[in-house]
Each structure stands twice: as structure tokens, then as C-alpha cells.
Amino acid sequence: MSAIVDIIGREVIDSRGNPTVECDVLLESGVMGRAAVPSGASTGSREAIELRDGDKSRYFGKGVLKACEHINTEISEAIMGLDANEQAFLDRTLIDLDGTENKARLGANATLAVSMAVAKAAAEESGLPLYRYFGGSGAMQMPVPMMNVINGGAHANNNLDLQEFMIIPVGAPSFREAIRYGAEVFHTLKKIINDKGLPTSVGDEGGFAPSVENHEAAIKLILQAIEQAGYEPGTQIALGLDCAASEFYKDGKYHLAGEGMTLSSADFTNLLGTWCDKYPIISIEDGMAENDWDGWATLTNALGKKVQLVGDDLFVTNTKILREGIQKNIANSILIKINQIGTLTETFAAIEMAKRAGYTAVISHRSGETEDSTIADIAVGTNSLQIKTGSMSRSDRMAKYNQLLRIEEDLGDIASYPGRGAFYNLK
């Protein structure tokens, strides 16, 4: 009864108004799984390939009809009749069918949509919530959210070079309370920004995008909001940064245009270290460019015992690259983005490899999202302990937070919120 009997790929629209791929998988029992894939703005050069049509007469070339056609033809032919419960076999079939290192032929947006839809159909037929289908009886840890409240870089049109300034409710007693902490700080920050006569419009991920004096001014705004909301910085709510440093790395230097600085890897490490000494920053993502492995080594040696150093563009959810990073003692955490690799099986392998090495795994959205909330179930199902899924606005972000609230309710008394314990990679 778990046999796949129909597969439909279609073009839908993401949170930025761009096309993306959605897939329906129908099983013999009549059960259906549906999944839609996200899309990034700042992307690592080694990510799996997102197949776009390139037809400038439709959506300025961003259409995904080719990817949908792949689903409706050769992918459908390859997996029709297979057992939806055999996720690893199905994903291997997709990988082999594509035949490239980076899913350039079929498109990672096509393979991922199918992979996710199959899992959701199998979970539905099993009568299990998706997180339980992924993780079994051991899935009971809620993730600590990293909430992007000020946007810069590729996610905003302001003078901030760093891409994300996040609040992390490490002192909350539960996920539900962590959401309350975040929402109250978000609304307080909105009032502070408004009172300064600055715009309170939000960026792609729901955070504010004010033009302020410099990066430290943005950090101080957030600290002010935390305190005015009645919380203690560092103890109850810590800070995180996503530098997205590849975006401003040119000719071997880091060009912070908003600061009027051009820095070497060592100098940028020193700047980040100074901020970590002055402010309660416990996580820095992509603190060096993806190809600056010497810079990553410098950063890890300097800060790796006291700050979570997350590789996003660095590792692109790829076990081959992660393995090399672990061997070279680069970073101490990996960001997990399902569309960077293109199947659930490969995603779970990256999470498991990170955990075995003592690295943390942070489940993440993309800047272009949909109402699909699968990453919430992945976070709990894999006991990944941390999630990045935007600010406290935009329904495409709230879809994930609301799913996590439902999961915590479903778990009841066995639900656990790790707080600062989610950062087990810090000494």
C-alpha cells in the first residue's frame, strides 16, 4: 500500500515572488504528500544546482518548468511503483538518475521536492507526525531559535555588510516561551527604530533593515530592545551574527564598505573577537569566505572554544566538504539547508557526521521560502537543537515557528528545550 502511484511537479511562487518547485506524491493507499522547496539569495558556489529555465520572457528567466518537467517525466518513470518507506533507496535512485556531482542535470529543486514529498506521504500513511517518522521515539528535543531581527548584506538595501543580526533565547524554559521572548524583543525593537525616525519595513527574512551608523550600532539597538523588553542580554537572550563573508571578500581582503574598512583575514578575526568580548555574541555564521580556509583556521583557533562558528557557504550541507573541514579543524558547526544538497538522505548524513565530530547542526530556512514547514520537523526529528527560520514576521517564517509550537504541544511533558545546552560545541 506504500507504493508510489502518481507524481506531480508544478511551478508555484515563493516568498519573494519567484517561481519554485512543488511536488505531490500519491500512494496506492490514497495518501498524498506535498512539498515545496526554498531558494537562497546569497548562495555558496558549491551548492547543488537549482535548475532555472533561463527563458527571459517568463519570470525574467527564473521559471522552473524544466525542473517540473523532469519530475513529471523521467523522475516519475524511475520511482513509480517504489515503496515510499524506502527513503534512502528512493533518494539514491534520484541521485543516480541525475548522474552529476551537483544535481545539475535534473536540478536539486526537482530532486528535493520529490524526496520531501515522498517522506511526507510515507509519514502520513504510517499515521505518524513527520518529526516522529524522521526520528522515532527519541525525537523530543525542541530547537533553540536563532531569530534574525536586523537584516543587512544581500538580504537588505542598507549600509550593513553583515547579513544577519540574531537574537537567541538561551534562557527560556520552553520553546513556547522562547517564541514569546523573541516576539516581545521584535516589537520593542520596532518601536525603538520607529522612534529614531527610521523605516520599519522588513527584509526577506522578516527582520528590520534600518540604515544605522555601523555594525556596532545595530548590535546596540538589539541590546537596547532586549533590555527594554525586560530581558537580560547574555543570560536570557544571547546574540548571533551571520557575516555571509563571501559576499564582501574580494582579492584576498574583506571589504566592509559600511565601515570604510578593508581587512585581512587576521584583522577581520580580530574585529569579530573584539565584538565577542564586548557583546554577548555566542554564534557567528560564515565569519570567513567559503574559499578562505586559512582565514577559517585563524578564526577557529582564535574563537572556536568560546563562540559557535557555523559553516554555511563553507560546507553547503555536503558531507565531503564537511569531512575535510572536520579533519582540518575548521569551524565547529554546520548550517543545514536542505536545498544545498537536494535529498533528505544526504541532509541527514550531514547532520549525523557533524554530531559525531562534536559539531552542532543548525537547521535553516532560505531567504526565499514557502508555507512548507518540513524543516521544523527535521529539526525535532534529528534532535538538531538549533533552528534558523527568520524573524517574528512574515507568514512564510511563522509557518515553521507555528509547526514547532504544535510539535511541542504534541510532545507534552517529554518535550525538552535545551537552551544554552544546544551549544555543546563550546568549551
UniProtKB/Swiss-Prot annotation:
The main place the protein resides is cytoplasm
Under Enzyme Commission nomenclature, its number is 4.2.1.11
Q: Which pathway does this chain act in?
A: Carbohydrate degradation; glycolysis; pyruvate from D-glyceraldehyde 3-phosphate: step 4/5
> Which molecular-function annotations from GO does this UniProt entry contain?
magnesium ion binding; phosphopyruvate hydratase activity
In this protein, the active site sits at E205, K337
Q: Which residues are listed for (2R)-2-phosphoglycerate binding in this entry?
A: Q163, K337, R366, S367, K388
Cited function: Catalyzes the reversible conversion of 2-phosphoglycerate (2-PG) into phosphoenolpyruvate (PEP). It is essential for the degradation of carbohydrates via glycolysis.
Tell me what this protein is called: Enolase
Species of provenance: Janthinobacterium sp. (strain Marseille) (Minibacterium massiliensis)
